[in-house]
Amino acid sequence: MGDEEKRNRAITARRQHLKSVMLQIAATELEKEESRREAEKQNYLAEHCPPLHIPGSMSEVQELCKQLHAKIDAAEEEKYDMEVRVQKTSKELEDMNQKLFDLRGKFKRPPLRRVRMSADAMLKALLGSKHKVCMDLRANLKQVKKEDTEKERDLRDVGDWRKNIEEKSGMEGRKKMFESES
């Protein structure tokens, strides 16, 4: 067993040594990578950013600041215009995709919620914001005059039989019945 223990210790020591060597190599590689990135950054800045010439007088510095602000404003306007264009095209794409699904018969079904909505609002939601449709559902209905016909009177009279029975029920009703017969 003594021989085997020595051998196991030697193997463990060798593993530890190899690990430490690998860690040292990795550390040097990381340092090289960091220095390479820093050099690339410096080269990019030197290439794309012109060196800043600071003039001697205060008015020249202010003029330089105004020029830089004008460039910033122009870049911001361009950025805003691009964002608006992107939003507009994405909205058009969504509308076209919805029309495509409608034409194919495959609807993307959103999760449904109960919403009280008028017919106009529903059509606006279905057709999109570009289409203006006004729909008055009551306009197509014909007007009906209420006529008091004989049939309706008969139906009302038939409805009154309950009242008659309620009046005749109980002692007072029977008393009235006898009084009316005599």
Swiss-Prot record:
UniProt keyword Acetylation, yes or no: yes
Chain positions with N-acetylglycine modification: G2
Protein name: Troponin I, fast skeletal muscle
Record key words, sorted: Acetylation, Actin-binding, Disease variant, Muscle protein, Phosphoprotein
Phosphothreonine: residues carrying this PTM: T12
Organism annotation: Homo sapiens (Human)
One function term, GO molecular function aspect: actin binding
Disease: Arthrogryposis, distal, 2B1: A form of distal arthrogryposis, a disease characterized by congenital joint contractures that mainly involve two or more distal parts of the limbs, in the absence of a primary neurological or muscle disease. DA2B is characterized by contractures of the hands and feet, and a distinctive face characterized by prominent nasolabial folds, small mouth and downslanting palpebral fissures. DA2B1 inheritance is autosomal dominant.
Positions where Phosphoserine occurs in the chain: S118
Region (Involved in binding TNC): 2-48
Lineage: Eukaryota, Metazoa, Chordata, Craniata, Vertebrata
Single biological process term from Gene Ontology: skeletal muscle contraction
Segments of this protein annotated with the region Involved in binding TNC and actin: 97-117
Quaternary context: Binds to actin and tropomyosin.
Function: Troponin I is the inhibitory subunit of troponin, the thin filament regulatory complex which confers calcium-sensitivity to striated muscle actomyosin ATPase activity.
One GO cellular component, as annotated: cytosol
Keyword match Transmembrane: no
Similarity field: Belongs to the troponin I family.
Membrane-spanning segments: none
Pfam families: Troponin
